[in-house]
From Swiss-Prot:
Taxonomic superkingdom: Archaea
Family (UniProt): Belongs to the UPF0212 family.
Official protein name in the record: UPF0212 protein HQ_2663A
PANTHER family for this protein: UPF0212 PROTEIN MJ0068, UPF0212 PROTEIN TK1194
Pfam family, one: DUF555
Organism (species): Haloquadratum walsbyi (strain DSM 16790 / HBSQ001)
Xref: NCBIfam families: PRK03922.1 (NF003035)
Source organism phylogeny: Archaea, Methanobacteriati, Methanobacteriota, Stenosarchaea group, Halobacteria
Amino acid sequence: MTNYLVAMEAAWLVRDVNDIDDAIGVAVSEAGKRLNDRDKEYVEVEVGATPCPACGEPFDSAFIAADTALVGLLLEITVFNADGEKHASRIAKSEVGGALRDVPLSVIDCVETEDDDT
C-alpha cells in the first residue's frame, strides 16, 4: 500500500461579485468552510492557475460575467494506503466530493509520496 498526493480542480460559482479578487476570496473561503464543517481540515484549498493562450504565463483561474464568477480551485489531499493511482483518485474524490456536494471535481494529478516512518 502506498501514499499519494492527489490534486483536484473544482469549479466554484460565486454570485453577485464585481471584482476578480473578491470572487477568488469568496470561493476559497466558502470551500474552506464547507470542508472544515465536515472535518476535512487536511484538504488544501487555493485558487487554480490557467495558462495564457498567447504567452503561456499562468494567471488566476477566474472569470466574471453578469456579476457571476466561475473560479477554478485547486484542492490537494494526501491519501494513505491506496492500492494505486486510480484507487487514490477515487478515495480523494469521495472524501472531498462528500463535503463539496454539487461542485464539479476533476482529478488533475496523482503523485506517489514517500512514507514518513521510513
